[in-house]
């Protein structure tokens, strides 16, 4: 590895942590905390997921693709159960569970090296590199965060205020650092 390879790897991992843990997760949490348990578990139709199911699904995905894989642990994910939750788990239980997984994911991302990003893994039966796994989690989390934001806006009829710092031109009035827990 060259110094440039290490720098690119460090930039990729830093950006991934900031996006996942400093932006998507806090905003998703804000959305969910604004909903009632009934809203979290409501589905507009049988083909759609509830926010509760999406939270269980994100927990399973982040745990499988980051925590379990990079720690070389046995994968015990039961993906179908994420969409068939039989009971209305309280919002606090859902958020605590995902928060625990996100803290573990943060620890994993903080210690990864360029060698880890290039190393081979098998996830969901697919041969991938560590880089693939990190990218998949950030992209996948962003997709479902967007769905949850949309559902929250639809149910509440309110602007979530995530971009209130932007001017009319879409630019920040001042630079704001995104903190990673």
Where are these regions (language model features)?
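Acidic/histidine-rich alpha-helical segments that form the ligand environment
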Residues: 86-122, 129-143, 147
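Residue-level signal for pocket-adjacent positions within structured domains
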Residues: 35, 78, 112, 116
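Active-site rim elements
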Residues: 10-18, 88-95
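Short, contiguous alpha-helical
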Residues: 2, 7, 17-32, 38-81, ...
């Amino acid at each position: 590895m060259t110094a440039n390879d290490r720098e690119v790897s460090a930039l990729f991992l830093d950006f991934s942590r900031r996006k996942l843990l400093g932006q998507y997760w806090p905003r998703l949490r804000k959305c969910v905390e604004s909903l009632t348990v009934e809203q979290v578990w409501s589905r507009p139709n049988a083909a759609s997921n509830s926010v509760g199911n999406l939270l269980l699904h994100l927990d399973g995905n982040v745990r499988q693709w980051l925590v379990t894989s990079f720690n070389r642990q046995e994968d015990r994910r039961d993906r179908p159960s994420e969409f068939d939750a039989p009971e209305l788990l309280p919002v606090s239980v859902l958020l605590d569970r995902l928060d625990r997984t996100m803290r573990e994911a943060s620890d994993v991302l903080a210690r990864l090296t360029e060698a880890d990003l290039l190393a081979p893994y098998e996830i969901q039966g697919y041969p991938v590199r560590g880089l693939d796994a990190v990218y998949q989690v950030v992209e996948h989390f962003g997709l479902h965060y967007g769905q949850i934001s949309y559902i929250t806006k639809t149910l509440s009829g309110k602007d979530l205020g995530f971009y209130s710092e932007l001017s009319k031109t879409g630019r920040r009035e001042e630079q704001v650092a995104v903190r990673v827990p």
